[in-house]
A protein has these predicted regions:
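Helix-biased "structured C-terminal domain" signature
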Residues: 1-424
Length: 424
């Protein structure tokens, strides 16, 4: 049985310490921060912060703590080691089926990766349950391969109290990332609402409704405008929601975006709004070190993107996108979506997800509680880009088909004209 305090205890091997902070200042959410066990064999000074620390915000103490524990287990499982059945070689020399990550239809690696000697992990291809090798840099965080060949990151990984829960969460995340990145790259005119309770039919459960109303009103009381939008996806019944917190323009104003997909629309609205508040808190924390200057261009790291989000250029880009949203003709409705249904819809939409079981990397005590972790490599879909220097990491077919797939007109014809996306 999942035991959150035991999961986060140093003896379990996931974390060295953690903190739980109640709402304070301008942050209306509970916050959990978890210092992860060190990355074996890595110089801590060169490890990205998100591989050293896991964090999560929630509308309640229990929500923040559970989210923080799940995030910590997921990030710990991404730390590279040799427990996944590593194979070393070039794609041509493996003698086994391997994912062509460099194929433009996947856009997950530089073309030179096709000839590079890499570590590979076995994955299950969901289309036929075949075992296929995938490049380790598409799984590990931090990655050890040259940054010029891949655009690694933690997206597509998830943990849960069962293998099925972890897989579902990871699949939903790759849907979110594909939907958001292509919608941003084409500046789609998304259907939107300013009132979250007009955005979803029916009545939410009491905790969800109270939390959603409290966060929405908190923004209004602070003079921050809230806009919710839906990105249509191939998965019928899955509500993919974007929430924008738009502070009036002034020096030092904060503008943030969050997103969440769920077959329960009120949960999607709450999750997206929580994430927008969480990003806002991260920006406020960054400002404690003083005004931001010398933001790298192009952006390469997650830290670069957080700093970029404090610039007037970033604020203008988000305001411009939200300004192009159109009133939604009807509210979202709840509809049960099964994991099998998600997989079927993804395959029909051109995705070819490959699943790597990360559970062997979890400490025995944690796995014995029931924790499971996976990473879904989103072949065929647009991944969440981190390094803006990689032109090859745009999935051009997904960008080209976005208006037709979603039914949302595009304001940009060339994705290269889009500003960097606002999801740190």
């Amino acid at each position: 049985m999942i035991d959150v305090p035991r999961t986060l205890a140093p003896a379990a091997g996931v974390a060295t310490r953690y903190s739980l902070v109640p709402p304070r200042g301008g942050n209306p959410l509970w916050s959990t921060a978890v210092a992860l066990a060190p990355v074996a064999g890595a110089d801590g000074a060169e490890v990205p912060l998100s591989a050293l620390v896991a964090g999560a915000n929630g509308h309640s103490r229990a929500d923040a703590l559970l989210r923080g524990a799940g995030e910590a287990v997921e990030r710990r499982a991404l730390h590279p080691d040799d427990r996944l059945g590593t194979v070393r070689g070039t794609a041509a020399g493996l003698g086994r089926p391997a994912l062509a990550a460099h194929d433009p239809r996947n856009a997950l690696a530089h073309p030179d990766s096709a000839r590079a000697e890499l570590d590979w992990y076995p994955a299950t291809r969901l289309s036929d349950a075949a075992t296929v090798l995938v490049p380790a840099p598409l799984v590990d965080w931090p990655a050890t391969a040259p940054g010029s060949l891949f655009d690694p990151g933690p997206s597509g990984a998830a943990s849960g109290g069962s293998a099925g829960m972890a897989l579902r969460s990871a699949l939903v995340e790759i849907v979110e990332r594909d939907a958001f990145t292509t919608a941003w790259g084409r500046r789609l005119r998304l259907p939107c609402w300013t009132d979250p309770f007009a955005a979803a039919a029916g009545t939410p459960d009491r905790p969800t409704g109270e939390a959603l109303r409290a966060l929405w009103r908190r923004a209004a009381d602070a003079g921050v405008r809230t806009v919710f939008a839906r990105i249509p996806t191939a998965v019928d019944g899955l509500c993919c929601v974007v929430a924008c917190l738009l502070e009036p323009e002034r020096p030092g104003a904060l503008v943030t975006v969050g997103m969440k997909a769920s077959d329960r629309p009120h949960d999607a609205l709450l999750g997206a709004l929580q994430e927008a508040w969480q990003v806002r808190a991260a920006l406020e924390a960054t400002l404690l070190d003083g005004p931001v200057a010398d933001v790298p261009d192009p952006l390469v790291t997650e830290h670069d993107r957080i700093r970029y989000m404090l610039t007037a250029r970033a604020r203008r880009a988000v305001r411009d996108w939200a300004g192009g949203f159109v009133p939604a003709p009807a509210p979202m409705t709840a509809a049960e979506v099964t994991t099998d249904g998600i997989v079927t819809a993804l395959l029909a939409d051109g995705a070819d997800p490959h699943v790597v079981d990360l559970t062997p990397r979890l400490p025995a005590t944690v796995a014995a509680m029931g924790w499971r972790a996976v990473k879904v490599v989103p072949a065929g879909y647009q991944h969440l880009r981190m390094d803006e220097t990689h032109e090859w990491s745009w999935n051009r077919s997904r960008l080209a088909s976005a208006p037709e797939r979603t039914g949302c007109p595009a304001r940009l014809t060339d994705h290269r004209a889009a500003a960097p996306h606002p999801l740190p």
